[in-house]
Curated annotation (Swiss-Prot):
Spans traversing the lipid bilayer: 4-24, 61-81, 131-151, 174-194, 253-273, 280-300, 375-395, 412-432, 483-503, 528-548
Keyword Isomerase: no
Keyword Transmembrane helix: yes
Organism: Kineococcus radiotolerans (strain ATCC BAA-149 / DSM 14245 / SRS30216)
InterPro entries reported for this sequence: KdpA (IPR004623)
Molecular function terms, GO-annotated: P-type potassium transmembrane transporter activity; potassium ion binding
Keywords of the record: Cell membrane, Ion transport, Membrane, Potassium, Potassium transport, Transmembrane, Transmembrane helix, Transport
Membrane topology: Multi-pass membrane protein
Any single Gene Ontology cellular-component annotation: plasma membrane
Principal location: membrane
Protein name: Potassium-transporting ATPase potassium-binding subunit
Compartments, record wording: Cell membrane
Length: 557
């Protein structure tokens, strides 16, 4: 089978798998968060935390719970990283220095997993398991909870309440993420992903030398790393390392784990609001942009200009030969269209066009399909903006699912779409304005700008992948990127919860002849246009100076 046939087979199998599970998983997610019964284990957790599981809260209480829990998580993980040298299973590794510990703690609690360190040489097994892997579960559950709270706000009929964060967090972790991650870890083990507790072992090589190989609890971390759209690797090479991703089967499974919850959440949304066509409209926008991104990235990497790529048949620099350009492009699209950030190839080595597309995925806000929870609430915020714009165009009162889009609602939505660009572009400008911080770039010109832009786009959008041409382990970048992660994660969450509270305080208006149908193909098309215009064109000047300029320069040469 040729490369084209193998690539199409992978994409087709992925599509079939996602189509097969998105309905049952989406319905399961809806039942999980709509139910009123608590499991015995859950009731025990609520008693320990002294939480009234039956209390319904307003959005300020919900937001304070999110921020309080995340702050405690950051402090706990920071202490864990600083004190590693005194902990068991540390493999003799010392604690992290303060700015790197801050960056790592915020990164994993913020579902970003930006790594300015090499995991195999910096962290021991206990920190990997009880520190980073635990946050892989909890950060994903926080995003899931916020998305569900927004949907509750749309469904509520004047109650002003959006649920209980502690109940949503517990259910998302115990009922959704833990079972799915366990199943994913078992399947990854069957494909050859490593799971043990060995340290560094030295083996003789066929060439007569020696090589030191590190084992560890990799499969258990790998499953939730992908399922929770986290992305932080056990090894510095991430999913390009054969212990994390040994073959084509494991690669396809990891891409499936990345996409399965984000693409199932629109179905859960449709079930919760009582109209599956609403979920299909959101899903169609996600799927259309994802498919276009995959096609463009694959084309760019398989039709690269220049004598060397043409002689090799594709741009294979920075890619594993066991995957090739098709599987690498599929993984790169999935990991940047969500908030995952895991990599099985070097994005910095992609063609200018291919690197530009994966960067575009980041700056579009990762809503196609986006991260666990964050993708859905990002799409719903953009749907609110779409309704508002459509209402202005045709002279109708803007309403979404029977909820009026007034000044308060559109203010929350507008601030939501402004936060990430402000953080991203400000951070990039500050880093480029000083010669000392510019010296961390390994490239100059348009590619150097792309590397810097990618770093802050990855941080502000909670992705975590990188163009490796930036030497980011410095006090400035550890601090600045950590701040970008915090602002890019939690400010949008607070605005989403404020929007949910505004909707929850309203009674649902009856649908009339003047109501804009938000489940029609026409609205879905306009929704798609708003995603592209609002999210992508905001960054066009920066993209024009970076990957677009590099691509045009390469075409001329």
């Amino acid at each position: 089978m040729g490369d084209l046939g193998a690539g199409l087979l992978q994409a087709g199998l992925l599509l079939l798998l996602l189509a097969a599970v998105h309905v049952p998983l989406g319905d399961f997610l809806a039942r999980t968060f709509a139910g009123t019964r608590h499991l015995r284990l859950e009731r025990g957790i609520y008693r320990v935390l002294r939480v009234d599981a039956d209390a319904d809260t307003r959005w300020p209480t919900y937001a304070l719970s999110v921020l309080g829990f995340s702050t405690v998580s950051i402090l706990f993980l920071y202490a864990f990283l600083r004190l590693q040298g005194f902990l068991p299973l540390s493999l003799g590794r010392p604690g992290m220095e303060p700015t790197q510990a801050w960056n790592t703690a915020v990164s994993f609690v913020g579902n970003t997993n930006w790594q300015s360190y090499a995991g195999e040489s910096t962290l021991g097994h206990l920190v990997q398991m009880a520190g980073l892997t635990v946050q892989n579960f909890l950060s994903a559950a926080v995003g899931l909870a916020v998305a569900v709270a927004l949907v509750r706000g749309l469904v509520a009929r004047g109650t002003g309440t959006i649920g209980n964060f502690w109940v949503d967090l517990t259910r998302g972790t115990l009922r959704v993420l833990l079972p799915l991650a366990f199943a994913g870890a078992v399947l990854l083990l069957l494909t050859g992903v490593v799971q043990n507790f060995t340290g560094a072992t030295t083996y003789p090589t066929l060439a007569g030398g020696s090589q030191t190989i590190l084992g560890g609890p990799i499969a258990s971390q790998e499953a939730v790393k992908e399922l929770g759209t986290n992305g932080g690797g056990f090894f510095n090479a991430n999913s390009a390392h054969p212990f994390e991703n040994p073959n084509a089967v494991s690669n396809l499974l990891e891409v499936f784990l990345i996409l399965v919850i984000p693409f199932s959440l629109p179905r859960a949304f449709g079930t919760l609001v009582g109209d599956h066509r609403q979920g299909l409209a959101v899903l169609s926008v996600m799927g259309t942009i994802f498919g276009a991104s995959l096609a463009l990235t694959t084309w760019a990497e398989t039709h690269a200009g220049g004598s060397v790529p043409q002689a090799a048949g594709a741009a294979m620099e920075g890619k594993e030969t066991r995957f090739g350009e098709w599987a690498s492009a599929l993984f790169a699209t999935a990991t940047t269209a969500t908030s995952t950030g895991a990599v099985n190839s070097a994005h910095d080595s992609y063609t200018a066009a291919g690197g530009g597309v994966v960067l575009l995925n980041l700056v579009m806000g990762e809503v196609t399909p986006g991260g666990v929870g964050s993708g859905l609430y990002g799409m719903l915020v953009l749907a609110v903006i779409t309704v508002f714009v459509a209402g202005l165009m045709v002279g109708r009162t803007p309403e979404y699912l029977g909820k009026r889009i007034g000044q308060r609602e559109i203010t929350c939505a507008a601030l939501y779409v402004l936060v990430t660009p402000a953080v991203l572009l400000t951070g990039t400008a500050v880093a480029l304005s000083d010669a000392a911080t510019r010296s961390a770039l390994l490239n100059t010109g348009s590619h150097g700008l792309t590397e810097m832009l990618y770093a802050f786009a990855s941080a502000a959008n909670n992705n975590g992948s990188a163009f490796a041409g930036l030497s980011a382990n410095t006090p400035f970048y550890n601090t600045a990127l950590g701040l970008a992660i915090w602002l890019g994660r939690f400010l949008p969450m607070v605005l989403v919860l404020a929007l949910a509270g505004a909707f929850a305080a309203q009674r649902t208006a009856a649908e009339t002849a003047g109501t804009l149908p938000t489940r029609s193909p026409t609205f879905a098309g306009m929704h798609l246009a708003v995603v592209v215009v609002v999210s992508a064109l905001t960054f066009f000047p920066a993209l024009a100076l970076g990957p677009i300029a590099e691509a045009l320069t390469g075409a001329q040469s």
